[in-house]
Curated annotation (Swiss-Prot):
Organism from which the protein derives: Cereibacter sphaeroides (strain ATCC 17023 / DSM 158 / JCM 6121 / CCUG 31486 / LMG 2827 / NBRC 12203 / NCIMB 8253 / ATH 2.4.1.) (Rhodobacter sphaeroides)
Reaction(s) the record says it catalyses: (4aS,6R)-4a-hydroxy-L-erythro-5,6,7,8-tetrahydrobiopterin = (6R)-L-erythro-6,7-dihydrobiopterin + H2O
Keyword Metal-binding part of the UniProt annotation: no
Protein name: Putative pterin-4-alpha-carbinolamine dehydratase
Assigned EC number: 4.2.1.96
GO molecular function terms noted in the UniProt entry: 4-alpha-hydroxytetrahydrobiopterin dehydratase activity
Taxonomy of the source species: Bacteria, Pseudomonadati, Pseudomonadota, Alphaproteobacteria, Rhodobacterales
Length: 92
């Protein structure tokens, strides 16, 4: 599954790949809880639109995101697409 995917750009952007779990993950830092929650809200709108949802947690200004395609048992292009969008939203 992940073998055919080009993970290099995402890894260079700070994402981590756990091949045993089939997961991409990244931690995002924000100055305030409100900024972190706003980021999560923006991501949630895209995730709902694309029907592909992250596993994540939030503690004050930190948001930890993990992506996998549970139905496929690992990473798919949907995860990479959402990861790219998440990076775009974090930079906005």
């Amino acid at each position: 599954m992940a073998d055919a995917l080009d993970l290099a750009p995402l890894l260079a952007a700070g994402w981590s790949h756990d091949p045993e779990r089939g997961v991409l993950s990244k931690t995002f830092g924000f100055e305030t809880f409100v900024a972190a929650f706003g980021f999560m809200t923006r991501v949630a709108l895209w995730a709902e639109k694309w029907n592909h949802h992250p596993d994540w947690s939030n503690s004050y200004g930190t948001v930890e995101v993990s992506l996998t395609s549970h139905d496929a048992g690992g990473l798919t292009e949907r995860d990479l697409k959402l990861a790219r969008k998440i990076d775009e939203l974090a930079a906005a």
